[in-house]
């Protein structure tokens, strides 16, 4: 195990029938919303904890219900290099999402918007959504969090910086 990595991983190996496509697309969207690392075709991974294990168990049940096959595995990387590559893949995916959120927050701060409070609420919701699937926070997380919450001061809303020291 590498410092700052998971140690144990939950792997989901799955196959979903091509037809009908609706269940396959729903499963793909669910996996995407969980922030999985794509290891190969039909093989995804998440760092192991009770929450991620349960989430992948639910996806496996959805795969079975769609007429496919799914197997859950608990694995430990034998190579520190391979584990770091997987962690980096997850970090880069979340960093891209945080950068997008940061850009939107900066644009909102620069533009005179009449309904800034509603947009701020949406940005906060998006930030929470990204953080739920962020297992190895990149530096962009803190920047996006600060940008979103600094808007609160300009809208008159209370500033709620999650995870910041009191």
Predicted regions and their residues:
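Positively charged, polar, low-complexity stretches
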Residues: 1-110, 119, 131-132, 151
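Proline-rich intrinsically disordered, low-complexity coils
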Residues: 20-23, 112, 158, 165
């Amino acid at each position: 195990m590498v410092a700052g990595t998971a140690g144990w991983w939950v792997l989901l190996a799955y196959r979903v029938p091509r037809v009908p496509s609706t269940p396959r697309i729903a499963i793909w969207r669910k996996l995407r919303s969980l922030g999985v690392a794509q290891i190969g075709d039909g093989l995804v991974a998440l760092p192991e904890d009770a929450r991620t294990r349960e989430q992948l168990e639910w996806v496996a049940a959805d795969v079975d219900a769609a007429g496919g096959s799914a197997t859950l595995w608990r694995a430990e990387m034998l190579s520190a290099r391979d584990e770091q590559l997987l962690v980096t893949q997850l970090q880069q995916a979340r960093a891209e999402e945080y950068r997008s959120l940061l850009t939107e927050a900066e644009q909102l701060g620069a533009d005179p918007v009449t309904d800034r409070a509603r947009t701020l609420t949406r940005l906060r919701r998006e930030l929470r959504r990204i953080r739920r699937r962020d297992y190895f926070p990149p530096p962009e997380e803190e920047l996006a969090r600060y940008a979103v919450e600094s808007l609160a001061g300009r809208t008159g809303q209370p500033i709620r910086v999650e995870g910041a020291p009191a």
